[in-house]
């Protein structure tokens, strides 16, 4: 029997790319992994099972969207990942008014599960529920299913709370967590939410990608 979200494929997907990439030294979205830009790889991965086109939350002067709709933050000042989530909520309310929720993924985590949206949607029981991914005992709220209905509360909180800790905002709402197991590879278990922050991480990601390709 379908849950509150009857068809996870109809959840609008958003790439969060509003970070500064300071530890990488260059824009992470355009570094190459396996001969393919991260932007291309991640947009393709999240879009595989979604019927609604992927949108990109990034700065207005983003150099190349690769055809994705560009949705800059509705509140300027680089207020963190939740500013991108708010932007996605506002965009969804305008362009996909049928959708109760949207899904976000960051631009720097290339190995997240293909069925991410379906798994996050499973525990959702109401229009105000949030669902976030977890793995190895850690929360990954940037991999989240977010209700459009809490946009006003999120905007008020972003403008009022100078610390803007994600966990503090989540504490205001009903949050359901979905734990994802590690991925078995030829060189050991891989955290599905491994992210690329530094050049060394990119080197490791190439090793994981090669291992995944060798794994039966």
Swiss-Prot record:
It holds the Pfam family NTP_transf_3. Its main location: cytoplasm. Its EC number is 2.7.7.77. It catalyses: Mo-molybdopterin + GTP + H(+) = Mo-molybdopterin guanine dinucleotide + diphosphate. Keywords: Cytoplasm, GTP-binding, Magnesium, Metal-binding, Molybdenum cofactor biosynthesis, Nucleotide-binding, Transferase. The keyword Electron transport does not apply. It comes from the Bacteria. InterPro entries: MobA-like_NTP_Trfase (IPR025877), Molybde_CF_guanTrfase (IPR013482), Nucleotide-diphossugar_trans (IPR029044). One of its GO terms (molecular function) is metal ion binding. One of its GO terms (biological process) is bis(molybdopterin guanine dinucleotide)molybdenum biosynthetic process. GO terms for cellular component: cytoplasm. GTP binds at residues 16-18, 28, 57, 73, 108. Mg(2+) binds at residue 108. It is found in: Cytoplasm. Its cofactor is Mg(2+). The N-terminal domain determines nucleotide recognition and specific binding, while the C-terminal domain determines the specific binding to the target protein. Monomer. Belongs to the MobA family. Transfers a GMP moiety from GTP to Mo-molybdopterin (Mo-MPT) cofactor (Moco or molybdenum cofactor) to form Mo-molybdopterin guanine dinucleotide (Mo-MGD) cofactor. PANTHER family: MOLYBDENUM COFACTOR GUANYLYLTRANSFERASE. This is Molybdenum cofactor guanylyltransferase.
């Amino acid at each position: 029997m379908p849950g509150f979200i009857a068809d996870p494929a109809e959840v609008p997907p958003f790439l969060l790319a509003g970070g500064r990439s300071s530890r990488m030294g260059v824009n992470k979205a355009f570094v190459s992994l396996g001969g393919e830009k991260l932007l291309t790889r991640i947009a393709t991965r999240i879009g595989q099972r979604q019927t609604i086109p992927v949108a990109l939350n990034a700065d207005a002067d983003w150099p190349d969207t690769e055809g994705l709709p560009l949705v800059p933050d509705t509140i300027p000042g680089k207020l963190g990942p939740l500013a991108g989530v708010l932007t996605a909520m506002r965009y969804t309310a305008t362009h996909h008014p049928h959708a109760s929720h949207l899904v976000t993924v960051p631009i720097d985590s290339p190995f997240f599960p293909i069925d991410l949206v379906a798994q996050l949607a499973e525990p959702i029981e109401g229009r105000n529920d949030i669902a976030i991914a977890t793995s190895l005992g850690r929360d990954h709220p940037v991999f989240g299913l977010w209700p459009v209905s809490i946009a006003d509360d999120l905007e008020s909180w972003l403008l009022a709370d100078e610390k803007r800790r994600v966990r503090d905002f989540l504490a205001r709402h009903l949050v359901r967590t979905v734990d994802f197991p590690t991925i078995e590879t030829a060189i050991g278990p891989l955290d599905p939410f491994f992210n690329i922050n530094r050049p060394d991480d990119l080197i490791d990601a190439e090793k994981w990608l090669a291992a995944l390709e060798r794994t039966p």
